[in-house]
């Protein structure tokens, strides 16, 4: 999967189209990512007693995972781009690059 934790992404499809956010967590097994402030859902939690005796419950708003095909990585210029790879000469490691401008991501 070419989108990693910490990347800034732009939502290109869905109800939050046009929103930018940072990837909180990536789920490679399901090809989904959790983006900060995007795809917010309301989750109903049951009332349960905490260790201090206070009860917690009600409606909680949180982010839900979004499919990786619905987001595009934002490059250093702030434009959405596809991700490519090149091999670094001195270290021999694979480095992610922007397909639009050729710079490292």
From Swiss-Prot:
One GO molecular-function entry: rRNA binding
Cross-referenced SMART domains: KOW
Extent of Basic residues compositional bias: 94-105
An annotated GO BP: translation
GO cellular component term, pick one: ribosome
Signal peptide: none
Keywords: Ribonucleoprotein, Ribosomal protein, RNA-binding, rRNA-binding
Chain intervals for the UniProt region annotation (Disordered): 75-105
Transmembrane segments: none
InterPro entries: KOW, Rib_uL2_dom2, Ribosomal_uL24, Ribosomal_uL24_CS, Ribosomal_uL24_KOW, Translation_prot_SH3-like_sf
Gene3D superfamilies: 2.30.30.30
PANTHER family for the chain: MITOCHONDRIAL RIBOSOMAL PROTEIN L24 (PTHR12903)
Record note on quaternary structure: Part of the 50S ribosomal subunit.
UniProt family annotation: Belongs to the universal ribosomal protein uL24 family.
Its job: One of two assembly initiator proteins, it binds directly to the 5'-end of the 23S rRNA, where it nucleates assembly of the 50S subunit. One of the proteins that surrounds the polypeptide exit tunnel on the outside of the subunit.
Annotated protein name in UniProt: Large ribosomal subunit protein uL24
Organism: Rhodococcus jostii (strain RHA1)
Gene: rplX
